[in-house]
Amino acid sequence: MNIGQRYGWEFALAVLLVMEILLFGIANPRMLDINILLFSTSDFICIGIVALPLTMVIVSGGIDISFGSTIGLCAISLGVMNQADIPMAAAIPLTLNVGAMCGIINAALILYTGVNPLVITLGTLYLFGGSALLLSGIFGATGYEGIGGFPQAFTDFANLTLLGLPVPLAMFIICVLVFWLFMHRTHSGRNIFLIGQNNKAAYYTAIPVARTLYFIYSLTGIAAAIAAIVLVSYFGSARSDLGSSFLMPAITAVVLGGANIYGGSGSIIGTALAMLLIGYLQQGLQMIGIPNQISSALSGALLIIAVVGRSISLHRHQIRGWMQRRRNQKLPS
């Protein structure tokens, strides 16, 4: 398989991303300002951080829809630890452990009950979300009020730059590189594809299915914790609803990026490009004055068009053969 065939979809997404930015730039020249392009990513890049390990979960044939609640629980946990005067140097690693535990709980329930991952993670979505609300209520932040009082150095973190890039964007780029190397250049990463293609065959060929699932679900939890830390720093307060709007954009990015929702195929680079495509679509529509409701509908339409286009691309030989047979049937004998 040559490079064009292997990375054709990623190349198409990159072209669409450039075209999208140029079109919005024609409508509003501010969209072509490099500073706006870079710093506007802070509004949506945390979705991408979670979407990267979610790609591995979906490639394995699973799904995790609880990560939004995991973000809320991790955010509240960080706020509670800050209120308890635990230093941020200790609170941040503990928050990452909370995220990892959420992922481990998901994997354990999926493996030992045999229930569909969608059903399990739907249950843990409410479990983690309810726990976040309970914690915030116990510590005085009723409803969706935030827990504030974070150190100035911490709240400044999300607004810092690294090599000219906003810190959240720099973290996303690092995550893309790490996850791409793991998924596409290691034996363990290839196991994820094999599990998604045929779970039973993976068991019989001695692939460590359980260990792999524990690992990728815990990675999703850790990514949710990282997103929570960045969001709390960005907004200056910890709220239980911080990840409530992440579900559909993240899954859309994974599917638009080329992942098969039934497992077996997917691309980290594709997910990253799709996340930027979706994020800049929302930003661009807002900059030209389109209401959020319409921009959400257009995002959904983009997903449908992309999925149909991807399906046609994957099955073009079958479609061409079917059309040829139809033409032959119409020819006079």
From Swiss-Prot:
Pfam family of this protein, just one?
BPD_transp_2
Cellular compartment(s): Cell inner membrane
Membrane topology type: Multi-pass membrane protein
What residue ranges are annotated as transmembrane? Answer: 7-27, 45-65, 70-90, 91-111, 119-139, 162-182, 212-232, 240-260, 261-281, 288-308
Alphabetized InterPro entries for the sequence: ABC_transp_permease
NCBIfam families to which the protein is assigned, alphabetical? PRK15038.1
**What is this protein's name?**
Autoinducer 2 import system permease protein LsrD
Gene name per UniProt = lsrD
